[in-house]
């Protein structure tokens, strides 16, 4: 996500770590799963402390990106739906290393696997950093 490089990188790192750890400990009957939740409608959006330092230099793209993320969060899944999904995964004996909540995010994850990196970047940029 533009202007969220650390956030995006940390999510990628957690997923990679989870997959590697699952591979290391699965011979001992231990499974590790990352649950990719997508947007969740919580009080986080209203509590966000915004800073758009550099917005003028980027032609308003930072504030547009934050605004789009807020819209996504406000239309996200409820915490109850996510909690039920996580509980269902936790009860499984054998789970995939990465589980994705919601049909929308499953489709997006699939598209990320098949689209070239440059095209993915252009699509995400057109949504979040016009």
Regions inferred by a protein language model and the residue ranges of each:
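Non-catalytic terminal and boundary segments that flank Rossmann-like NAD(P)-dependent oxidoreductase
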Residues: 118-130
């Amino acid at each position: 996500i533009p202007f969220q490089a650390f956030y995006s990188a940390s999510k990628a790192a957690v997923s990679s770590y989870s997959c590697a750890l699952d591979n290391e400990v699965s011979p001992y009957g231990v499974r590790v799963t990352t649950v990719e939740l997508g947007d969740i409608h919580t009080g986080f959006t209203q509590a966000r402390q915004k800073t758009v330092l550099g917005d003028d230099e980027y032609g308003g793209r930072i504030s547009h990106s934050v605004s789009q993320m807020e819209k996504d969060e406000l239309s996200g899944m409820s915490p109850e739906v996510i909690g039920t999904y996580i509980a269902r995964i936790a009860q499984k004996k054998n789970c995939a290393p990465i589980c994705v909540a919601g049909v929308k995010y499953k489709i997006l994850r699939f598209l990320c696997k098949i689209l070239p990196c440059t095209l993915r970047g252009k699509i995400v940029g057109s949504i979040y950093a016009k």
